[in-house]
Amino acid sequence: MIKAYYPLLTNTTYLNTAYVGLMSNQLAEFRRSHEEFYLKNGGDQYKMKAYDDLDSMHQHFASFFGLTSDRCFGTSNFSAGIRTALSFLPKKMKVLLIEEDYPSLTDAFKEEGFDSAKIAMQSQIEDAIKEKLKSEKFEVLALSIVQYTSGLLIDQEYLFRLKKEYPSLIIIGDGTQFLGAHPFHFDKSPFDLVAGSGYKWLLGGFGNGIVMLSKDFVAMTSQKVESIRERFFNGHFNILGMASLDFAIRELFQNDFQSLVKEKAALSEEAKNQLIADEFLPQWVGERTFHSSIFNISGGQELFTFLQKNNIRCVQRGSGVRVSFHFYNTEKDLKKLLRTLRSFRELNSHLPFN
């Protein structure tokens, strides 16, 4: 049933949600009617209604992500949201980052003038973080919950243990490749700040995102939540983008999001096992307890072109080709990917795959 909501899936194998999530028929119709109101009633009525709707929208966001509405903030995208949030932190704080992490995350700290150090991305990244924290003092750890190139999923249980060992450590997560793809309850997580865009796994279209702050983070700012909200909503906001995210989240609620991500997780686990068995993925992917539904397959431009010719949507990332599975994907999509990869390998036996 879910697949029928997305017209592109009738003629395309779409394995590119990690790049851009699909738009449903329902969201497209909502956006048309939303802008029709603007056209027929004028910008003044359109803007006043948007501000009237803000509280209810944030209540929906808070309910979905597991926190109170006064500590979540709609924003135009991850990049804008993280920079606004970082403006509340003292610049003297030392930050630990990961090399090859999402550039807009690492650049945000550089732009704000924070003292930072980086560790190399590696398959057992949690061990590397632990060793670095032992050797140097850091006030902030910032990382993507899912690494956008490889699909590595950070172990949140490890982050809980880290919090216990370093209770004053502020943990910041880029959730763009995580939110909407995995179950998440912010107030039961180890994070003090999570920000993400809504156009990928949340399927909210362009022009929206979310920022979530822990009670400890808010207390550390010595600001009232009203003052924090004013900074996030300084000037006008993306009215259509915010309304679209609200609509998308209500749709996820209505379609039983928890069941959808369970189905996605099962398909992703099957994809991981098959891709490893066929030696299309490096061994470290199978050695970790958990992985996301994003996979990076070696093959470069030749493989990318071959997949495109076979009507499989994907994207080049790093030295490989990245594919990703969402809940609107099916086992049929996985079988087509595997069949196409095997055909490519037969035709290009000289190329390495892992």
Feature-to-residue mapping (PLM):
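Active-site PLP attachment segment
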Residues: 189-224
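Structural signature of PLP-dependent enzymes
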Residues: 45-46, 229-272
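Conserved PLP-binding catalytic core of the aspartate aminotransferase-like
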Residues: 265, 269, 278-310, 317, ...
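A glycine-/small-polar-enriched, mobile loop at the entrance of the PLP active site in fold-type I
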Residues: 11-58
